[in-house]
Amino acid sequence: MKMGRRTQTVHHGYRRRRAEEQPDYEVVIVFDPKGDADLLKRMYVECERAGRLDEFYVFHLGHPDLSARYNAVGRFGRISEVATRVAGQLSGEGNSAAFREFAWRFVNIIARALHALGIRPDYQQILRHVVNIDALFVEYAQKYISEHDPRAWDTIIQIEGKLNDKNIPFNMKGRPLRVVAIDQYLTQKRIADPVMEGLKSAVRYDKTYFDKIVASLLPLLEKLTTGRISELLSPNYADLNDPRPIFDWMQVIRKRAVVYVGLDALSDTEVAAAVGNSMFSDLVSVAGHIYKHGVDDGLPGSLASGKVRINLHADEFNELIGDEFIPMVNKAGGAGVQVTAYTQTMSDIEAKIGSRAKAGQIIGNFNNLFMLRVRETATAELLTNQLPKVQIYTSTPASGANDAINN
């Protein structure tokens, strides 16, 4: 379904007021699950023809040495968006819903603490502290206590010196003594700090029980941090020797850039889907910010700006689709996002998302539907069932023949 010229939008530019002005190009973002080299080459050629190579970004999981870098949780309007983007990819069906809610809360605790420490969240940081929350608890406690009561460390050291296996609470067994001492000090002083309270509640879980309830979160994070992928999704902003650019969606939109996203799904479908969904979730968040505040919000001397047309092309989008894609097609239009999706059959969408109702919701939110060589009956009926019925009053048979020699 929905076929078209994906590279044509590279040349689109808004009308110029004066001939000497540069055209105000449209944003073009192409998601390609397979990472097709021909499509990438075509986009490169069209960007060169349009004079847009300086604003052309290539993100490709199959070529980490050449790929740009991207942090899906590094930019946010509200800190809670970090937890939503991570936990939103977990299953919410049946008994899994409770584990997803806990995962959201725990990731939110980590993200708030990192933000308070001045550390930009990324998947590597989140995984590190999911596995070992104690280090983050101690680090934030050092910052908080040094700012509010530097002499408290003498008391904490005294408490730590008196601890042994007999007087450590059962739920704190297996925790470092420094963690137990800080927890007891904070309980005595009744310190009211939301971030500190969240971390304290996390370390108070029995360690064995805690490991069980975060077990559903670890596979997702390991998919996003294993091997060279970690370099792309958790970029080191302080490494000045790395020539690979780092981009985010707001930067792309403000620069009217062109982005090619190759997810290398033939090599690893699970990682491709996880990365694609995280990008969609981030883009939905940016669209919400643009809808409320405009594109240039926060820039010096900026005024309320109009919408920028954002052309989003998702090839074989059934490979990428998830709950994050639904608000993209039914709400992001208010921020200027125009989604063009390409797939073969409706069954592909339904099989991926696991719900016929959600599949119908996604398809129903597209304004236009184009079909070419459709083989599945259910897919063809998406078009034929919308055609009006007419009455045929007369039917006239006709036949003819031509002499090929005379013509």
Explain the meaning of each model-derived region:
Residues 1-337:
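P-loop NTPase motor domains
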Residues 15, 98-105, 109-112, 248-251, ...:
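P-loop NTPase motor core of the ASCE superfamily
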Residues 32-34, 342-346, 374-376:
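A short beta-strand-to-loop transition that corresponds to the Sensor-1 phosphate-sensing loop
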Residues 36-38, 64-66, 346-350, 378-379:
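Short gly/pro/ser/thr-enriched loop/turn and capping motifs at secondary-structure boundaries
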Residues 332-353:
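Sensor-1/coupling segment of RecA-like P-loop NTPase cores
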